[in-house]
Amino acid sequence: MEGFNPADIEHASPINSSDSHSSSFVYALPKSASEYVVNHNEGRASASGNPAAVPSPIMTLNLKSTHSLNIDQHVHTSTSPTETIGHIHHVEKLNQNNLIHLDPVPNFEDKSDIKPWLQKIFYPQGIELVIERSDAFKVVFKCKAAKRGRNARRKRKDKPKGQDHEDEKSKINDDELEYASPSNATVTNGPQTSPDQTSSIKPKKKRCVSRFNNCPFRVRATYSLKRKRWSIVVMDNNHSHQLKFNPDSEEYKKFKEKLRKDNDVDAIKKFDELEYRTLANLPIPTATIPCDCGLTNEIQSFNVVLPTNSNVTSSASSSTVSSISLDSSNASKRPCLPSVNNTGSINTNNVRKPKSQCKNKDTLLKRTTMQNFLTTKSRLRKTGTPTSSQHSSTAFSGYIDDPFNLNEILPLPASDFKLNTVTNLNEIDFTNIFTKSPHPHSGSTHPRQVFDQLDDCSSILFSPLTTNTNNEFEGESDDFVHSPYLNSEADFSQILSSAPPVHHDPNETHQENQDIIDRFANSSQEHNEYILQYLTHSDAANHNNIGVPNNNSHSLNTQHNVSDLGNSLLRQEALVGSSSTKIFDELKFVQNGPHGSQHPIDFQHVDHRHLSSNEPQVRSHQYGPQQQPPQQLQYHQNQPHDGHNHEQHQTVQKDMQTHESLEIMGNTLLEEFKDIKMVNGELKYVKPED
């Protein structure tokens, strides 16, 4: 083998075995770099033939245990002059397995055989390799610039042929030598014999670095002392320029001449075809192999698998692993490349996270249960059906256990539901919205159970939002609304205490009944006209049935009370603002039995007929001794059977007459409620047309 062989270090001086942590290898270097190049070009003698005759300096390389060779990684991490101590931590942080290891690599006899082998692989891809720096154990190749400056082209045209030949020789030295010294060193083409020859030779200028020739692509070849083999790693597979095969370059011509000397017929045929396709502007076929990860493609060139070089970057300032002396921030931004043999590696550049779908908030709001809850009112107005069938919807019965229908107290239009629709809920009273009304036969003594039979009547009379097609009010038996007038047990106790006793004077009984009627009139602020009409009928009926002689005086008092009541109702009606406060809550009519027992009056089983002015007199004589009303039979059953005297019979007649007066009042109200209609969300009394 010609030239320097790293295996010759075995013939060096003996190793100092006293130091167990480090090994010192002493070997002889050539005289100078120029002699090494001349001998390498002319088929020179081996430098290891006579190491003692060469007066060369001795270089000692210390390999510590922490920087020992790793057979699994196939990478030798020796310290170079550019890898200073301040940048060692960057090298340790790098994962060497992420680099692209070329495999299989032949057993090179000399490091000069590495470049032709790499050129045969990378030339078909449009990559022209030159040596960036080289030493005994490592050679770094870079991608040569595709363009040159205009001044360099002009100078090259003006130069004579002899000077151009000298520039080519200096160019060879520039490509194959390492600039270890930062000072302006002089490079000669021959041995250094005299100082006159040294002064006559001009110093070589370094090649200018621009954005056209600063490509981050690097290939590193390192020699392993243990394995006695070379390992080649692609450290950065990015390029700052477009890749294009150039058959007219000087490097390619030298490479082609080397192939002819080696008699590599197959490689010559492939490159001849490559030249023809390039000159004819034909596409260059590449043997593409999909990667195991499924994200990248690979190229097989001369039995070596490489990743594609399609990721060409436009920036020329990206750093590499080999140039660790550059800015550390740029080195940290360099992307790690996947290994060819590593099947678990994934190229994260091609992985894209799926975009999250943009959700429409209006669509989500329309799916809420509040929309179905509020649109019941609008559907009811169109169809005219009661809310009993629409009440058992899944949007409402899923989380509320009470059968109470809230649509009857929410007069909010919900055709287009939004959050700003329900803005003010202070007008609605949700006091007992989630409390069920107890069963009437449960046996409890709660004050509400006394009036359970009248709940249906009150819901029918005062259901403002439940109407049918004829604008008649309907109500359910369990729909019970509490009003601000009768919402406590104290109001019930006042009504119970105001009932007439068993034995009482007829005049006092009539006065107390009048007070009850006044209480009822004060609690109703909407129906002043028909209440005034009813008071006239009830007053005439009571005087005709009881037979009081002072009818004229009492009628005057009644008319005076009626006028005062009408004025008070008109004043109170002007103070009412919203329709929700105008809803009647409860209407209870109580009658005491002969022994103080309280009996609710059922208005559902009576004849609902409109009473004329003379009808109370007919109704007073309707029931005779042969035909008694149902309430009178009930009172006879409650009386003791030991005897019936004349006083008890008169008391029963008085109670019956009082009961009939209350019954007439209830029937009249039921008939008069048909004249109440909903106008602009409010209850209005409409006079019947004659």
Swiss-Prot record:
Principal localisation: nucleus
Top-level taxon in the UniProt lineage: Eukaryota
Residues noted as binding Zn(2+) 2 in the record, renumbered to the chain: 143, 215, 239, 241
Binding positions (Zn(2+) 1): 110
Motif placement: CDC [2Fe-2S] cluster binding motif: 291-293
GO biological process: cardiolipin metabolic process; cellular response to iron ion starvation; chromosome segregation; establishment of mitotic sister chromatid cohesion; meiotic chromosome segregation; negative regulation of transcription by RNA polymerase II; positive regulation of iron ion transport; positive regulation of transcription by RNA polymerase II
Bias type Basic residues, positions: 148-159
Any single GO CC term annotated in Swiss-Prot or TrEMBL for this entry: cytoplasm
Keywords for the protein's UniProt record, in alphabetical order: Activator, Iron, Metal-binding, Nucleus, Transcription, Transcription regulation, Zinc
Any Pfam family hit: AFT
Effect of inactivating the gene: Two-fold reduction in expression of LSO1.
Ranges annotated as biased composition (Basic and acidic residues): 160-174, 639-649
Listed Polar residues bias regions: 181-201, 339-351
Activity control: Dimerization via the binding of Fe(2+) or a [2Fe-2S] cluster decreases the DNA-binding activity.
Compositionally biased spans, kind Low complexity: 621-638
Oligomeric and partner information: Homodimer. Dimerization decreases the DNA-binding activity.
Extra facts: Present with 2730 molecules/cell in log phase SD medium.
Purpose: Transcription factor that activates the genes for FRE1, FRE2 and FET3 in response to iron deprivationand thereby plays a central role in iron homeostasis. Also required for the expression of LSO1. Recognizes the consensus iron-responsive element (Fe-RE) sequence 5'-CACCC-3' in the promoters of target genes. Iron could interact directly with AFT1 and inhibits its activity. In high iron condition, the presence of Fe(2+) or [2Fe-2S] cluster leads to dimerization, which in turn leads to a decrease in DNA affinity.
Protein name: Iron-regulated transcriptional activator AFT1
Organism the protein comes from: Saccharomyces cerevisiae (strain ATCC 204508 / S288c) (Baker's yeast)
